[in-house]
């Protein structure tokens, strides 16, 4: 099993066959546990590769959310983190030297686990209950 708790094959997902079944159906695993984990799966493209390499794995992981874990899954990037993942498409646009907006980004979003929303030119996936855990944001406010 993987050491990183946010790895793709962490925990029970690293088990196979009977070992997986025994762990999956164990009494202690029949209870729903609260989680603040979010997942973002992105289709690989030049723009997304730039975002992963130049923003997410450097400044973002170091200064914003150190729990971010990125795995190369053939044609996709599998990203898992605790709390939230926020993508500022203005930063990507600046890196690319051309316009890149949140709708361009959404074309490459394959799957998510969490609550996803856009606000302005930012895409966010969060574990928070929007409107309950914290006040809803308004782009025009």
From Swiss-Prot:
The organism that produces this protein has a lineage beginning with: Bacteria, Pseudomonadati, Pseudomonadota, Gammaproteobacteria, Methylococcales
The subunit field of the Swiss-Prot or TrEMBL record says: The soluble methane monooxygenase (sMMO) consists of four components A/MMOH (composed of alpha/MmoX, beta/MmoY and gamma/MmoZ), B/MMOB (MmoB), C/MMOR (MmoC) and D/MMOD (MmoD).
Q: What are this entry's molecular-function GO terms?
A: monooxygenase activity
Keywords (alphabetical) are: Monooxygenase, Oxidoreductase
Give the family per the record: Belongs to the TmoD/XamoD family.
Question: Which protein is depicted?
Answer: Methane monooxygenase regulatory protein B
Q: Name one Pfam family in it.
A: MmoB_DmpM
Q: What InterPro entries does the annotation carry?
A: MethMoxRegMmoB, MOase_MmoB_DmpM, mOase_MmoB_DmpM_sf
What role does this protein play? Answer: The B protein acts as a regulator of electron flow through the soluble mmo complex, switching the enzyme from an oxidase to a hydroxylase in the presence of the substrate.
Where does the chain cross the membrane? none
């Amino acid at each position: 099993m993987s050491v990183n708790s946010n790895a793709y094959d962490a925990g029970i997902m690293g088990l196979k066959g009977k070992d997986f079944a025994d762990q999956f159906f164990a009494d202690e695993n029949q209870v729903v546990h609260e989680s603040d984990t979010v997942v973002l799966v992105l289709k690989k493209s030049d723009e997304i590769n730039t975002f992963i390499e130049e923003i997410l794995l450097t400044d973002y992981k170091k200064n914003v959310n150190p729990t971010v874990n990125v795995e190369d899954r053939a044609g996709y990037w599998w990203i898992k983190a605790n709390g939230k993942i926020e993508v500022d498409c203005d930063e990507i646009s600046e890196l690319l030297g051309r316009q890149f907006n949140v709708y361009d980004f959404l074309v490459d979003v394959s799957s998510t686990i969490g609550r996803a929303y856009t606000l302005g030119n930012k895409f966010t996936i969060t574990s928070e209950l929007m409107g309950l855990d914290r006040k809803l944001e308004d782009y025009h406010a």
